[in-house]
Swiss-Prot record:
It is found in: Cell inner membrane. The keyword Transmembrane helix applies. It is a multi-pass membrane protein. One of its GO terms (cellular component) is plasma membrane. It comes from Shigella sonnei (strain Ss046). The chain crosses the membrane at residues 12-32, 37-57, 84-104, 116-136. The gene is cbrB. This is Inner membrane protein CbrB. Disulfide bonds: none annotated. Belongs to the CbrB family.
Length: 157
């Protein structure tokens, strides 16, 4: 498979599924670590919660997917190293992205958005990014679309 196809495949899957894995973790974290009644409030605003998580997490997840797709063959072919690189890359890219967003300040228009991106809520940013990076790096080779051969690009390589 060509590198460009792998970059598109990994990037899109990471961007679509990565934030959803983060939301799943946050819902479980709120249910077990906080009051379970808070979960009822989140379920009531779940579409807004999903939209907010996708808008804040899709770009870092896309960049993490591109990074995992561009890993050298020795690292990318071994599951444990790929998961380690995906998890660390997810955290680093998410923190850089959040720092840029907070620095711009024009994009952080709502108070909720500013609270999520502030330094006070590391659990909301780092752990979902770490888990999404590890899980997506682990399952990315099993997702459909990776083994499709294309006669136009196969003849070029």
């Amino acid at each position: 498979m060509s590198v460009s196809r792998r970059v598109i495949h990994h990037g899109l899957y990471f961007a679509v599924l990565g934030p959803l894995i983060g939301v799943l973790f946050l819902v479980l974290y709120i249910f077990f670590a906080k009051e379970p009644l808070v979960l009822l409030v989140i379920i009531q605003v779940l579409p807004l919660f999903l939209l907010l998580s996708i808008t804040t997490g899709a770009i870092p997840a896309l960049l993490t997917g591109v990074m995992v797709a561009c890993l050298p063959e020795k690292i990318g072919s071994q599951k444990n190293y790929r998961c380690l690189a995906g998890g660390i890359g997810g955290v680093v890219i998410t923190e850089i992205y959040c720092a840029v967003i907070v620095h711009i300040k024009g994009m952080a228009s709502s108070e909720l958005f500013e609270n999520i991106l502030s330094g006070d809520s590391l659990v909301v940013r780092i752990i979902p990014a770490l888990l999404a990076g590890v899980v997506m790096s682990r399952i990315i080779t099993r997702l459909p679309g990776l083994d499709i051969s294309c006669p136009e690009t196969d003849s070029l390589s």
